[in-house]
Amino acid sequence: MEPAFPASSAGVQSQSGPEPGAGQQEPPPPATPLRPVASQSRFQVDLVTEGGGGGDGQKGQTAAQPAAAAKDKDRGDGGAAAPSPASPAAAAEPPAAAAEEAKGRFRVNFVDPASDEPPLSSQQQPPPPSSASSAHGGHQPPSESMNGYPQNGDTMMSEGSLHSSGTGAHHYYDTHTNTYYLRTFGHNTIDAVPRIDHYRHTVAQLGEKLIRPSLAELHDELDKEPFEDGYVNGEESSPAEEAVSKHVADNKGVVKFGWIKGVLVRCMLNIWGVMLFIRLSWIVGHAGIGLALLVIGTATVVTTITGLSTSAITTNGFVRGGGAYYLISRSLGPEFGGAIGLIFAFANAVAVAMYVVGFAETVRDLLVEHNALMIDEMSDIRIIGSVTIVVLFGISVAGMEWEAKAQIVLLGILLLAIVNFTVGTFIPANDKRAKGFFNYRGEIFSENFVPDFRDGEDFFSVFAIFFPAATGILAGANISGDLADPQLAIPKGTLLAILITTIVYAGAAVSVGSCIVREATGNLTDAIIPGTVTNCTNVACKLGFNFSSCATNKCSYGLMNDFQVMSLVSGFGPLITAGIFSATLSSALASLVSAPKIFQALCKDNIYPGLHVFSVGYGKNNEPLRGYVLTFFIGLGFILIAELNVIAPIISNFFLASYALINFSVFHASLAKSPGWRPAFRFYNMWISLIGAILCCGVMFVINWWAALLTNVIVLALYIYVTYKKPDVNWGSSTQALTYLNALQHAIRLTGVEDHVKNFRPQCLLMTGAPTSRPALLHLVHAFTKNVGLVVCGHVHTGPRRQALKEISTDQAKYQRWLIKNKMKAFYAPVYAEDLREGTQFLLQAVGLGRMRPNTLVFGFKKDWRQALMKDVENYINAIHDAFDYQYGVVVIRLKEGFNISHLQAQEELCTSQEKSAHPKDIVVNLEHSDADSSKPSSKSVSETNSPAVCQDQKDEEDDGKASTQPLLKKEVKDPSVPLNMTDQKLLQASSQFQKKQGKGTIDVWWLFDDGGLTLLIPYLLTTKKKWKDCKIRVFIGGKINRIDHDRRTMATLLSKFRIDFSDITVLGDMNTKPSKDNITAFEEMIEPFRLHEDDKEQEASEKMKEEEPWRITDNELEIYRMKTYRQIRLNELLRENSGTANLIVMSLPVARKGAVSSALYMAWIETLSKDLPPILLVRGNHQSVLTFYS
């Protein structure tokens, strides 16, 4: 029998040779079976070979299955066991029928990588019920007959493998002769059922990435060669898969937080800052209870909208570390993300200093109160702040787990302080009445409900003071990488934190406004003796105290004057001080942790290349120790300044800029209508998010207008920098989605616009083949289409279909990336066809979208047409005819040295491979190439000889489409002992000549025939470009000798109406003069090999030859077009005489009548017309006007 496919994945050696007999003992399985890596759950396909002519009824077997096992496994009755040779059923089944049944079948074996146990052999595997029953000849109970198998056919899937029974064994399924496994969907095909592991990134945090079968594996013909290593397409443990395994292993033991400890606690601690204890009472005093609640409510509206937007973004896919930077960058792209990420990380680093200085100031006030200053007030702040940040730095470096424990302790202290304040409002305040505290009083509430702004304060200034307290809502999101489930934790924790803290702020505002009067002296002597008549009318007088002296003298107590009102009201004053310490330290600790995490994520993305050193993480939690050190020194520096009144508003604006962009991200993503924008969190609205973004921007200017302007300038500067650097990332941002949507909408809108001559643009289908192989052709066409018209680089792939289609799939991204990297505003369009003509026809008909379709076909001249196969020449000329048929304009460009440098690229690649080889051999490359044939790569003949290598010593580069011609175009020959030959040197220089500034020269336009104006429009467009602007246009036209002046004036008038500048007009009156004999002779010698010479042959022979070789030139044809031939020869003489020194020649392309002029004669005309000249464009429009003098 034929050798079958090896199946190393099963751990069974492949077998070939004669089939063993029925009684032959089965070889034992190897002790250590081969298995795929942990990151694979793959499959293999075994061909079932045709059975031999034996009489035992066996239908053949796979190599992975021993013969004895095959007899038990291969059964044709759908479920019964295969009969043994001795059974009647075996004799009853005809061998021919068995062999016929086996034809065309293949067996799908699935490999479970999750199990460490060796596979069961065929004898060890428990059979299905029908098999067991039949084999043992009797009925067994269901529990026994199903021994080793799941009870239901749909329970075969396990977490480790799609096709594992969960018992640790690998099962091999014959899905065509065994219908048992058809009960479980997905077990009878290599097609994969839907599974989450197929959608993971290469290195996923929640599991391993599995690779589904490719479309080619399902659709292509089955290869006759065995799969390498037993895996489909020879799949092995790739570097990416090894990285997955390593990443999963490294993640063991990582500390992850839930929504309470990770988000809720952090957000509440950051929002409950010192504002709650030392500024809220002052706000109520000025704004009154009513406006104070409005201030809190307005801030809550902004933070709630931002929280909703944050929730929408975080539930639209898996969230990694980086907080606000990650959310914005993955939504709006690297430009906004890079700008915000840097300032947001810096803002958090400086916020550490702000909170620590707030703590130090509180400690300093205690020292002043007890007369215990160390040096002076400012120096004490620096000393206390420095010691504090060192302690906080030690906690953060110790790890997130220790930091989280410290936050829990601080939250406990803070909650005790809030409870202490609440209880204190109910304790009778007999000894505190002189300081303005009277417990809950309706009169005090009524008086304090209305505002009483003083000292130039107003609603907006009070709001500006309060709002920074609400900027802690992203404290949980900032450590998104350390959350167990960010998609659940961030929305739940953030929104709940906003709700709780808002209730506490509002409750505290109402409490202090209901208990304490605005001003109090603190003197018990101001108590009103009952029966005494006073002139005061405020609520304090009604409560027994006359504080009217505060109207003229500065008082120290009351809502307006005392920042320590919370301590006054509380049941135990020192606990409020501890609460202030807790609020400042917890906020400082949260910022100290957030800043390095955000900065690390920013550096990992390599948005700013110089900062990549800070992306390194340490330990199981990937702690950014370098970022901690940087944040420590930034915070320490601002602590030593000890004056944060100037920097504080800028920091608040940095936070608000981040919130504005988060809101805008949701609006932008919703506006783009990307199918990928589908957040699991549904309670958001794109217009509310837009309002939130506008509110954030408004609040920025309310807090401090100059700080808002400075923030916007910094963000804009960073945005421009990142845009200019163009980081090589692709995150599927909403910016890309909206760009697509706008392009789609505008393309559709454009289809309803009728063409107009004033809006004509040359839109070129440029037959470059691989764009890297003809750079000069691409640069020249790009010069007159850049920012004006469309360029599509057509590439016709020929040869074996399967190979060509694979090349197309890889070349599409490769060459489009090369065009972008080389700043070519062009598209790449590959197509598969039998030959160049067919491929060009496909492109002419199909390329483009709506009005964005090519209207001009551009070819490079086929320089080697006389040596090439005439079939290729016929295809080349017919492609030009096809373009005219499709109403395209045609441009044929000729460069004396040629365009095709693919043989130099091939030579470079061979040199590179030679340098990499352990035993380098001398290689000689013999190449024959064409400048026009873009249907296939140049033919190569590679031979190993002892001659010196003809290659340059150049640096090896990966063949990824990134400027692969740049080494050839920019590097000089470094090794003089192996130079390029003279022809290749000239070709190499010519390939880059259109990349240089052309300098002062001329563009000679030979506008011999009116084609609609394309021959004149192209040179005009060239002169508008920077590299060609110093060139002057000279126009040459045909005319009569006796009307030269008249023809010149007529043309000058026409050009002036077209608004086209020119330096000179030349009228050629001797165009129809007979060319020189030498040139005529040269032409005749050139076409001699292509002539039919029918007069020298019998009529039947000549007709047969003409039918077989239609490209040949007949004597009759040559005679009919003799004058046209002479014209081409004469024009070449005039061109060399008048335009031999021009920078560029643009000339009307002669048109050959289809079916009348042979391909060889037409090529000879073009060859004769354009030889021995500077770069020349032979142009023929489609005879529709492209110029107009009407407005």
From Swiss-Prot:
Binding site for Na(+): L269, W272, A583, S586, S587
Binding site for K(+): N270, I271, Y355, P468, A469, T471
Impact when changing T184A: Does not greatly affect cation-chloride cotransporter activity
GO biological process, one term: potassium ion import across plasma membrane
Record note on quaternary structure: Homodimer.
Consequence recorded when altering T189 to A/D: Abolished cation-chloride cotransporter activity
Bias (Polar residues): 142-155
Protein name: Solute carrier family 12 member 2
Function per UniProt: Cation-chloride cotransporter which mediates the electroneutral transport of chloride, potassium and/or sodium ions across the membrane. Plays a vital role in the regulation of ionic balance and cell volume.
Gene assigned in the entry: SLC12A2
Keywords from the named record: Cell membrane, Chloride, Disulfide bond, Glycoprotein, Ion transport, Membrane, Metal-binding, Phosphoprotein, Potassium, Potassium transport, Sodium, Sodium transport, Symport, Transmembrane, Transmembrane helix, Transport
Biological source species: Squalus acanthias (Spiny dogfish)
Nuclease is among the record's keywords: no
Biased composition (Low complexity): 13-25, 59-69, 80-99, 131-141, 935-948
NCBIfam families: 2a30
Catalysis: reaction(s): K(+)(out) + 2 chloride(out) + Na(+)(out) = K(+)(in) + 2 chloride(in) + Na(+)(in)
Pfam assignment, any one: SLC12
Organism domain of life: Eukaryota
